[in-house]
Each structure stands twice: as C-alpha cells, then as structure tokens.
Swiss-Prot record:
Note in the entry: In contrast to the orthologous protein in animals and plants, this protein does not contain a HMG box DNA-binding domain. This function may instead be provided by the HMG box of the associated nhp6 protein in the FACT complex of fungi.
Record text on subunit structure and interactions: Forms a stable heterodimer with spt16. The spt16-pob3 dimer weakly associates with multiple molecules of nhp6 to form the FACT complex.
Keyword vocabulary terms for this entry: Chromosome, DNA damage, DNA repair, DNA replication, Nucleus, Transcription, Transcription regulation
Protein name stated in the entry: FACT complex subunit pob3
Gene Ontology terms, MF aspect: DNA binding; histone binding; nucleosome binding
Organism encoding this protein: Emericella nidulans (strain FGSC A4 / ATCC 38163 / CBS 112.46 / NRRL 194 / M139)
Length: 575
C-alpha cells in the first residue's frame, strides 16, 4: 500500500490522505468526513502534470468522470507510476501544460472533459460535469456557463465528496462563463469534427461523407451532447410546449428530467437542477384568466451578465391538457409514490405545478387567506419605479412580480409607511407604501396603489402584527388647512377692508389674482380705467383704493387724489 499526505481532492480547501492499494484508491479529509473510494476496475487512464499546489494526478475513470488529486511532490511520480503499472495495468502519462498565454488553439472533446490545446499541449480543461449550460451567443460565438459551487454558504465541510464530479468547496471567486470564438465552417464526421483547413479534433476518418456546416453550430451541438444538456440528459418524464415566460421574457419548451429540467427557446437554452429551486409560488392574476407559476432559484439563472433569481411563467386558466408521464410503473411506485400520477387530464397550470412539486419536493406557496383586495383579488396592482406588476400578500412574505421580481419576508419588515407623493389631483386616487426592513437592510417602495386598497392593506398588516405608519392623514390635514386659509383670504378680499393696502411691490409678486372676476380681457383696464365697473362687492372708491400703487398712503386721501396719481403710473409703465 502506498500513502500520501496533504493531498487535495477536486479543488477542495481541506487536505487529506490518499492511499493506493491493489483493490483501488481512497481519500479521507484530515478534519474528518466522508471517504472517497475508487475501485481499480473503474480507473481508465491517469495523467501527471504540474498544478496549483505542486503536482497533480488526474484520473479518468470509466464511470465517475474526472478525479483530480493535487499536492504531490515531484519525487512521488516514481512511486505512483509503479503502483499504477503493477496494480492497475495503467501507464501514468506525464503531460506539460501550454504556458505561452495564447488565447487561440484547438478544442478537443474527450470522454469526460473539454480540453483547449495550444500547440498540442493542454492550456486548460473543463470537465463536462462543471458545464451547466451553453448557448449560441452569436454567429461565430459560443457561450459556456459553468456550474456554481455546490454550497455557496459553506454549510458543508470543506472537502466534502457527496457531489462527485463537482467542485467540492470552491472559493468566493469563481469562473462562471467562458466564450469561444469559432469562425469558418467545419465537417462533422462519424468520429469527430474536422475544420475547413485543420485536422480533426477527435480524429477518425470518413469526412468525405460529412456535411459542411457552421463551425460554431457544430461545436455547440457536440458540447450539448457531451455535457448532457440537451435531449440526451436521461429520459424525459414530461414535456410542455411553448410556455410563455415573463422572466426571462420569451416562450420556452419545458423538458422535465429526473434531477433537472430544461428550458428550450429559439435563442437560449437553460438547464436547471431541481435542487436550485428554493421557493415555489402559484399566484392567480387579477384578470381571472391567467395564473402565474413562480420559481425562486439559488443560484439564479444567468443570461450573459443578467441574473434572474425568479422564473415567472404565465398560463391560461382554461387551457386543458392530457399528459401521460414517460415513467416506468416500477419507478412510479417506488420513488414517486404519492407524489406523481401516471396520467393527468386537467388545466395545464395544475399539471405543471403537480409535476414540479413531485420531482422537486418543494411545497407550493399560495396567497394568504387573510388578504382580499377591494375587488376580491389576491394581488394588488402597483409599480416599482416604472415597472408595473402585482404585489401578492402571502402568509409569511410579500412578492412582487413579474419584473423586477421582489421577495420580502415578513420577519424582516420593521415598518410599513403609507404615503401620498406630491399634491396633484391624481395623488388623491393613489398612494404608495414603503416597506422598511430591519437592521438597515434597506427598503422597498411600491407606488400607484389604488386608494380603495388602503383599508384591506391596513387590516392585513395589523393581522400580521406589522407596525404601520400612515402619513396620508397628515397630508390630508395639511391640504384641508391650506384650503381653509385660501377661503379666508378670498372672503376678506371680497369684504374690502379686511386686508391692508400692501403697495405695488406686493402686487408685482402676485402670480395669480384669485379674486379677479372681470368681464374684460385686460388686467390694465380693470386697474387703470376709471370708467370700469368692478364686479366685486365694494364701491368704486374702495376698488380705487385697493388698486392704488401706494404713492400716497394717507387714509384720508379722496378719490380725486387717486385719479391724479394714475397718469404718473401710466407714464411709468410705458418707459
């Protein structure tokens, strides 16, 4: 038996001990945990190369993908190669990596990984098990999305081997996407792909019968097949065609497999594990015609630089479907007993919900019975900034859909503030609510809510023991007080002596004369024409005093005096 210390398995953060014996090899983490074993009959090939923590032994297994053991010393090569030759009958191949730094080369599709070679030396390899999705990003460009770490919160011990073939304990920074530019055309042969002026990437003959196609398309199709992203990812239990998705926007076919489901669109394809579904909502729309199925994903769905933490489907309530599951009776009775039925014949939204629930094991969350809107619906129409949507009130949370999908847990809510923005007439018909979160976690504002929904919202938040701050009553009192002040000012003006003569300076500052009720189209005629008859309640003399520019402020001045001052004002105005 050969033993090696401080060896890292599959990019783990924690080292362990690796042991080789005639029956196979094993690895146990130093801090304790599950032991990984590999039977000798499952070892297909082995490669030795320089790596991050010293030297790496890469084992290509017959059924378990790629196993990476890093941390060996250079002197360990002789012991390892001798043990593999005697016990397993395998020669350990010593490989040197390409260190030129070139970003162009040849792609090689091996049994378990995609290798990128520069001058016939590997620059890097990507195991197929690490590829979550691939898309045609352009005519000659293929995007490859990589799986995120199994447990981003680090709840599992470092070095865990429960998810073979995936990163056991990755660091905080990860590579999530790569893009390959593949120009020109290529020929797909029986044994591989041959470029226009290049040798075959997978070797073999028979290119005479091959059909010349776009090289990027062939690369994409072969990667889909190797990484088991497409139809070859096991047996399809059920398929739903042309389902409308609001987030991400488009129509997708849904293929449901044993451990994952796939969304197939015209431009993008997505492969999503059921284990990524953290929340499952069934939300009826206010139009009584459609319903929404919302899936909360962690890690979120990615489309380039855009993340979609929620998947939102919209389905018609009256659309019936007849579906028979593509599943053996034995599998249905053992693994999915009381979870799935062999045949469904009911509305499509119920069928999709039941199959998703059966395969993922997630509980379906529906709107709370404690809330009914003014019009008898489960959702309230509102908007986040310029995006309109529906806000649903659940037993333990709030959710706004479709875009941007926003999820708020009740336990994190500190206070809900109801307010009216601005003093426009429309503000009296609508109001806003601001949900402030505890511990400075921020706030969410929902705008343009119908005024009739105020009472149902207040009753719901009170039932959930959430503090409510109503700023609308303060705004209403302020508006009423301002209106009363305006009425007092108008009545005092009409009485004549209620307001003192403020002089011409104050008259110039007036933007609107609310007491003006003249039949004439000219303000100047009312102010200066002595023959003009006011429609107000006071006498001509009182109106003249009120219109005086303040040249003579003596209260005993008669009307003749006022008339003598008027020509001066006219000549002053004309300058």
């Amino acid at each position: 038996m050969e033993s090696f210390d401080n060896i890292y398995l599959d990019l783990s953060n924690q080292p362990g001990k690796c042991k080789l014996a005639e029956t196979g090899l094993g690895w146990r983490p130093s801090g304790g945990g599950d032991t990984f074993t590999l039977d000798s009959s499952n070892i297909g090939a082995a490669q030795w190369s320089r790596a991050a923590k010293g030297y790496e032994l890469k084992i290509l297994s017959r059924s378990s993908g790629v196993i990476q053991l890093d941390g060996f010393d250079q002197e360990d090569f002789e012991r390892l190669s001798k043990a593999f030759k005697i016990w397993y009958g395998i020669n350990v191949e010593s490989r040197e990596h390409a260190l030129r730094g070139w970003n162009w080369g040849k792609a090689e599709f091996t049994k378990a990984e995609l290798a990128f070679n520069v001058q016939n030396r590997p620059a890097f390899e990507v195991p197929y098990s690490e590829i979550s999705n691939t898309n045609l990003a352009g005519k000659n460009e293929v995007a490859v999305e990589l799986s995120l770490s199994v447990d981003p919160n680090g709840s599992k011990p470092a070095g865990s081997t429960k998810n073979r073939g995936r990163k056991a304990a990755a660091g905080p920074d990860e590579l999530v996407e790569m893009r390959f530019y593949i120009p020109g055309t290529a020929v797909k042969t029986e044994n591989g792909i041959k470029g226009e002026n290049a040798d075959e990437k997978n070797g073999g003959e028979g290119e005479e019968n091959g059909e010349e196609q776009n090289a990027a398309n062939l690369f994409y199709e072969l990667l889909m097949e190797k990484a088991e992203i497409g139809d070859v990812a096991g047996d399809t239990f059920a398929t739903f065609l042309d389902v409308l998705h609001l987030t991400p926007r488009g129509r997708f076919d849904i293929d449901m497999y044993e451990s994952s489901f796939r969304l197939r669109g015209k431009t993008y394809d997505y492969k999503i594990q059921y284990s990524s579904i953290k929340k499952f909502f069934l939300l009826p729309k206010n139009d009584d015609t459609h319903t929404l199925i919302v899936l909360g994903l962690e890690p979120p769905l990615r489309q380039g630089q855009t993340r979609y933490p929620f998947l939102v489907m919209q389905l018609k309530l009256d659309e019936e479907i007849s579906l028979e599951l593509n599943m053996t009776e034995e599998l249905l009775e053992t693994r999915y007993k009381d979870k799935l039925e062999p045949r469904y014949e009911e509305p499509i939204h119920q069928v999709i919900t039941k199959i998703f629930r059966g395969l993922s094991g997630k509980k379906v969350i529906m709107p709370s019975k404690d809330f009914v809107s003014h019009h008898g619906h489960s959702g309230v129409k509102c908007s986040i900034k310029a995006n309109e949507g529906l806000l649903y009130f659940l037993d333990k949370s709030l959710i706004f859909v479709p875009k941007p999908a926003t999820y708020i847990q009740m336990e994190n809510v500190a206070v809900v503030t109801m307010s009216r923005v601005g003093g426009a007439i429309s503000a009296s018909r609508t109001f806003d609510i601001t949900v402030s979160l505890k511990a400075g976690m921020g706030e969410h504002q929902f705008s343009n809510i119908n005024r009739e929904e105020q009472q149902p919202l207040e009753e719901f938040f009170k039932a959930k023991n959430i503090r409510i701050k109503n700023e609308m009553s303060d705004d209403t009192n302020a508006l009423i007080a301002a209106a009363l002040d305006n009425d007092d000012m108008m009545s005092s003006d009409e009485d004549g002596g209620g307001r003192p003569d403020r002089g011409s300076a104050d008259e110039d500052e007036e933007s609107v004369d609310e007491d003006f009720q003249a039949d004439s189209d000219s303000d100047v005629a009312e102010e200066y024409d002595s023959a003009h008859e006011s429609s107000g309640s006071g006498s001509d003399a009182e109106m003249d005093d009120a219109s005086d520019a303040g040249v003579d402020e003596d209260e005993d001045a008669d009307a003749d005096m006022s008339e003598e001052e008027r020509p001066k004002k006219k000549s002053k105005t004309g300058k």
